[in-house]
């Protein structure tokens, strides 16, 4: 039982204090509930608690569901990558802390690889930062360089963490949509999606600090052309703006297309941070290693964020990754190089998925890069009007499909700001970096689905 004083006020007149005996049951609040009221969330994370991955990964956890939602590979990893990790685990000093900004052998390997690509010398100690995945690189960049009140331009649809990361920094996301110039009756590809240069320029202001670029793009699979990148570069230079370039799918580009690094364009190196990912490069998403590459005057601010948060990344993983890179750096012109063999393998899987989607009346957007394929589900005519939810149609459709067809995907409106969601809610995203048996299971679901429609 608790003893407390209750002060009573009536019509502005102060009454004498009286003692009241009460219990927590009378108040109807448990101790944890009272603590929850007392210790609320920090304002910087207000409204950021919803996450598409938490919700839909849980739905796909049922073993009977074929998971084409979350973007993790279930294909066989390169054996040499696994072998290098095994070796590293048995070296005593590789099980201890390493350099906080990147294991020496890894930053040297990255310097060698990207030095060849950029055709310039990259300082491994000053111009490269190894991070906790591409997420870590994005977080470091935004926290280290974006101030409250700044504006950050984001193209829609966008990888879902961009918006909340910008808001956590107290900044304002400014959105511009990619629009499709699709012609009915023709093959729909990610190249059909582009931005309007005049509309993009209108988004720049005196408050613009940065633009976030994603190429190859998730979820659409767009590979930005040199001409498109030049428009972005010219605007960044004109408005003295940073470019945060998320290029984690850089090696996954398909026939007829080429990945171009925006930092390689004239005048862009000094204002660009380029993000890479071990998970996407070597199909090891669970390693959670990424990197930022850019000029020392920008990287140093990202280092400050890292040293006051995670400080360093796992040593044996970095050491193993370095050795894997050296193996493929030495054979970059060889078809067996993983940078070359993986996109060829995935192009076959992409084409297979496109056929499967077409077979049930879904209209796919053929990606030029990445390992996701989007489909328009409106032609299926699945009536979900009786579902009691104010969620966008694609959210309800994916939940319905997961429950009734045992096939999971991700709603594309999850990659949109609130204003753009209605324009994308008939699209869903499927992942195709899956082993053949997984795609076989998906094919069987599609075949059964199609036969029941007939």
Curated annotation (Swiss-Prot):
The keyword Amino-acid biosynthesis does not apply. GO terms for cellular component: cytoplasm; mitochondrion. Pfam families: Aminotran_1_2. GO terms for molecular function: cysteine-S-conjugate beta-lyase activity; kynurenine-glyoxylate transaminase activity; kynurenine-oxoglutarate transaminase activity; protein homodimerization activity; pyridoxal phosphate binding. Gene3D superfamilies: Aspartate Aminotransferase, domain 1, Type I PLP-dependent aspartate aminotransferase-like (Major domain). Its cofactor is pyridoxal 5'-phosphate. The modification N6-(pyridoxal phosphate)lysine is found at residue 280. Pathway: Amino-acid degradation; L-kynurenine degradation; kynurenate from L-kynurenine: step 1/2. Substrate binds at residues 71, 218, 429. Its EC number is 2.6.1.7, 4.4.1.13, 2.6.1.63. It catalyses: L-kynurenine + 2-oxoglutarate = kynurenate + L-glutamate + H2O; L-kynurenine + glyoxylate = kynurenate + glycine + H2O; 3-hydroxy-L-kynurenine + glyoxylate = xanthurenate + glycine + H2O; an S-substituted L-cysteine + H2O = a thiol + pyruvate + NH4(+). Homodimer. Catalyzes the irreversible transamination of the L-tryptophan metabolite L-kynurenine to form kynurenic acid (KA), an intermediate in the tryptophan catabolic pathway which is also a broad spectrum antagonist of the three ionotropic excitatory amino acid receptors among others. May catalyze the beta-elimination of S-conjugates and Se-conjugates of L-(seleno)cysteine, resulting in the cleavage of the C-S or C-Se bond. Belongs to the class-I pyridoxal-phosphate-dependent aminotransferase family. This is Kynurenine--oxoglutarate transaminase 3.
């Amino acid at each position: 039982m608790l003893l407390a004083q209750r002060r009573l006020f009536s019509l502005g007149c102060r009454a004498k204090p009286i003692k009241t005996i009460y219990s927590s049951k009378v108040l109807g609040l448990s101790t944890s509930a009272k603590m929850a009221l007392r210790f609320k969330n920090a304002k910087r994370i207000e409204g950021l608690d919803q996450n598409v991955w938490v919700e839909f990964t849980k739905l796909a956890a049922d073993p009977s569901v074929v998971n084409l939602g979350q973007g993790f590979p279930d294909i066989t990893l390169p054996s040499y990558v696994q072998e290098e990790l095994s070796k590293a685990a048995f070296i005593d000093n590789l099980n201890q802390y390493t350099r906080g900004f990147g294991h020496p052998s890894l930053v040297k390997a990255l310097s060698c690889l990207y030095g060849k690509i950029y055709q310039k010398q990259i300082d491994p100690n000053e111009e490269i930062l190894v991070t906790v995945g591409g997420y870590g690189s994005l977080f470091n960049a935004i926290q280290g360089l974006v101030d409250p009140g700044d504006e950050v331009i984001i193209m829609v649809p966008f990888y879902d963490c961009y918006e909340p990361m910008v808001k956590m920094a107290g900044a304002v996301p400014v959105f511009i949509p990619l629009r499709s110039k699709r012609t009915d009756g023709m093959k729909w590809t990610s190249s059909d999606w582009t931005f309007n240069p005049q509309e993009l320029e209108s988004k720049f202001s005196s408050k613009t600090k940065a633009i976030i670029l994603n190429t190859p793009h998730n979820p659409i699979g767009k590979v930005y052309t040199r001409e498109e990148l030049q428009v972005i570069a010219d605007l960044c230079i004109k408005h003295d703006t940073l470019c945060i370039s998320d290029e984690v799918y850089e090696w996954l580009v398909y026939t007829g297309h080429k990945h171009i690094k925006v930092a390689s364009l004239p005048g862009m190196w000094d204002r660009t941070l380029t993000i890479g990912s071990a998970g996407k490069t070597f199909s090891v998403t669970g390693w959670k290693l990424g990197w930022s590459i850019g000029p020392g005057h920008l990287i140093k601010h990202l280092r400050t964020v890292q040293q006051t948060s995670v400080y360093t990344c796992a040593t044996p993983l970095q050491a193993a990754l370095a050795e894997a890179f050296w193996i493929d750096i030495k054979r970059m012109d060889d078809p067996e190089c993983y940078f070359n063999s993986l996109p060829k393998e995935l192009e076959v899987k992409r084409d297979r998925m496109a056929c499967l989607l077409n077979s049930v009346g879904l209209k796919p957007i053929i990606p030029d890069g990445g390992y996701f394929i989007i489909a328009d589900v409106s032609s299926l005519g699945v009536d979900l009007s009786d579902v009691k939810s104010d969620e966008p149609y694609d959210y309800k459709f994916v939940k319905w499909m997961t429950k009734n067809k045992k096939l999971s995907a991700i709603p594309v409106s999850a990659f949109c700001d609130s204003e753009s969601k209605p324009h994308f809610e008939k699209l869903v995203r499927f992942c195709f970096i899956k082993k053949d048996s997984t795609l076989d299971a998906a094919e069987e679901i599609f075949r059964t689905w199609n036969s029941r429609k007939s």
